[in-house]
C-alpha cells in the first residue's frame, strides 16, 4: 500500500523505497518463519512463538529510509483517519501505554499459541497489532506481515500459492476493515469477537491454497 505520510521523504522516491522494502520484508518474513519452525522446543508439538524482536524487524525492514526510527515503538500520539474525509475513526492507546499493551499482547499470544489453531492466532495478531498501533507509521503492513508469519509458523510451513493472504487483504479492504471494526466494537464492551476476522482469513487462505 502506497503511503504519503512518512518522515524522511514522500512522493515518487518514497514510493519506490516502499516497493523495495516490501521485497526485503518478504525475505525477513520467510527467514522468521524458517527460524521458528527449525527452533521448535524439544518435546513440543508447536514451533517457537515469535517475539517482539521479530515484529520490530518486520517493521524495520518495511519502513527503512522512510522513518527516523524504523523498528522502534512510537513515542508520540497517533490516530487512524478516514482516507477520504480525514475524520478520526480510531484512537489507539497513548504512546506511554504502548510498552504495557505490547507486553500484554505477547503474553496473550503465548497462551493462544498452544490453545488455539493457526487461524485463531493470525486473527488475534492482525487485529491486536492494529488496535495497539505500536509504531508511528507502517502499522498496517507490519500487522499483516506478522499475522501471516504467525499463520505460517503455526501451520509449520511457508505456505505455497501465487496469491497470498497478504496480497488479498489489500484487494479486499472493506471486508478487512469490517472484521477489525467488529473486534474493536467488542473490545469496547470488554469482550472478544474475532469470529468475523477468522472467517475472513479462512476465506483468503482457501483462495491462496487454490492458487497453487
Segments and roles (model prediction):
Residues 1-212:
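FIC/Doc superfamily catalytic core
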Amino acid at each position: 500500500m502506497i503511503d504519503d505520510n512518512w518522515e524522511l521523504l514522500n512522493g515518487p522516491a518514497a514510493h519506490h523505497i516502499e516497493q523495495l522494502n516490501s521485497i526485503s520484508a518478504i525475505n525477513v518474513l520467510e527467514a522468521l518463519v524458517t527460524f521458528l519452525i527449525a527452533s521448535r522446543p524439544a518435546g513440543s508439538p508447536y514451533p517457537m512463538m515469535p517475539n517482539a524482536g521479530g515484529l520490530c524487524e518486520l517493521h524495520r525492514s518495511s519502513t527503512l529510509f522512510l522513518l527516523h526510527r524504523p523498528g522502534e515503538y512510537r513515542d508520540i500520539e497517533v490516530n487512524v483517519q478516514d482516507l477520504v474525509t480525514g475524520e478520526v475513526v480510531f484512537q489507539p492507546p497513548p504512546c506511554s501505554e504502548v510498552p504495557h499493551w505490547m507486553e500484554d499482547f505477547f503474553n496473550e499470544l503465548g497462551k493462544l499459541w498452544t490453545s488455539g489453531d493457526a487461524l485463531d492466532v493470525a486473527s488475534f495478531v492482525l487485529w491486536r497489532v492494529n488496535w495497539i498501533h505500536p509504531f508511528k507509521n507502517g502499522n498496517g503492513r507490519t500487522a499483516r506481515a506478522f499475522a501471516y508469519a504467525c499463520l505460517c509458523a503455526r501451520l509449520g510451513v511457508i505456505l505455497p500459492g501465487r496469491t497470498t493472504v497478504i496480497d488479498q487483504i489489500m484487494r479486499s479492504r472493506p471486508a478487512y476493515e469490517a472484521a477489525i471494526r467488529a473486534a474493536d466494537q467488542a473490545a469496547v464492551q470488554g469482550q472478544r469477537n474475532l469470529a468475523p476476522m477468522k472467517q475472513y482469513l479462512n476465506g483468503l487462505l482457501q483462495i491462496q491454497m487454490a492458487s497453487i
